[in-house]
Amino acid sequence: MDNSMKNIFRQGRLFIALSLAMTSISAFALTQQEVDDIIKPLMKQEQIPGMSVAISVNGKQAIYHYGVQSKQTQIPVSDRTLYEIGSLSKTFTATLATYAQIQGKLDFSQSVSHYLPELKGSAFDNVSVMNLATHTSGLSLFVPSDIKTNDQLMAYYQKWLPDNEVGQYRSYSNLGVGLLGIVTAKQLNMPFSQAMEKLMLPSLGLKHTYIHVPKSQEKYYAQGYNKQNQPVRLNLEILGPEAYGLKSNAKDLIRYLEINMQSIKVAKTWQEAIENTHTGVYLTDSFVQDMMWESYPWPVSLSQLLQGNRDDMALKPQKVELIKPAMAPEVRAYYNKTGSSNGFATYAIFIPEEKIAIVMLSNKWIPIPQRITATYQLLEKIER
């Protein structure tokens, strides 16, 4: 990556040809039919039982529901329907970490072993908290299947050695964000699930977002379906709460994205915590790696989004460059995050300058390109 590419990102301009001309938004102008024309063919093609799409433009929300929560019960999808949001959960974990930072309890430049003495003398003497928050620790994607307890997990971390120099490669990692959650919870002096469910989520006004779905809400928890159309549900294993464990509905998630765009104001500390997750720390070949969010200069083409969300980005280490100094949160940017579990698919985007946010939720796993393409088609219709 050369300096010219970095400059292009800094100036917020496109570095590849733009596939369409974007115009400013005058009003919320999507009809039900326009959304149907994009979502219904996708559902048919991918055999999706149920979907929700929430859109916010200039502070005005519209939520569209399709199909059923479960093929067995045939209960229609509604505002209350809960979906597994997979790795979109990682942005919540990053926000909890930046909250701890604002409280003076966490320093992102410190080594991980500074906060976890049991890891002193390990590779984590040279891994910073920021490395965990930006997928640049070198830790692998999945927790090894034989690790079932915290003691086993810590033993794994103690022995772990990176394959590449820390901070030189982006390796998308549940083990990394999981460890970020462990460090954050320790510094906040409460279990991670408690910090998320009792401290952060209520502070953001997210009343139907959970790690553990309460009994009273179980009837709204959609049944997920895998690639083979078999019913599946998330089994929360170790580091699940920190890395991919949240369930939420379209209404809560569009609120979360509106908070990210400052369309909705929350307490100053939490607004600052959310804003800090938009800091640009590393440059990949396609996007800026923020703290779990990924951002692109706006306007952005569909081809660039597909390139940045290609499978290799999650499955193989990618060379990155540290941005010095880190980029302040960019308003003229397209922020996105995918989320998946075996039976659910999520895609969330927001563009602060345009005050547009979209979240797409389905109770079947579908390929990422299909999610991005459908979302981009919605965006084109909003922006026409």
Swiss-Prot record:
GO cellular component: outer membrane-bounded periplasmic space
Residues that coordinate or bind substrate: 337-339
InterPro entries named among the record's database cross-references: Bact_CellWall_Synth/Modif, Beta-lactam-related, Beta-lactam/transpept-like, Beta-lactam_class-C_AS
Molecular function (Gene Ontology), one example: beta-lactamase activity
GO biological process: antibiotic catabolic process; response to antibiotic
Active site (catalytic residues): 87, 172
EC number(s) stated in the UniProt entry for this protein: 3.5.2.6
Subcellular location, principal: periplasm
Keywords: Antibiotic resistance, Hydrolase, Periplasm, Signal
Signal sequence region: 1-29
Catalytic activity from the UniProt record: a beta-lactam + H2O = a substituted beta-amino acid
Compartments in which it is found: Periplasm
Extra remark: The class C beta-lactamase family has a specific amino-acid numbering system known as SANC, for structural alignment-based numbering of class C beta-lactamases, or else the simpler name structural position. A multiple sequence alignment was used to derive a consensus sequence and then the consensus was numbered taking into account insertions and deletions. This allows use of identical numbers, e.g. for active site residues, despite differences in protein length.
Record-stated family: Belongs to the class-C beta-lactamase family.
Free-text function comment from the UniProt entry: This protein is a serine beta-lactamase with a substrate specificity for cephalosporins.
Protein name per the record: Beta-lactamase
Gene (UniProt): ampC
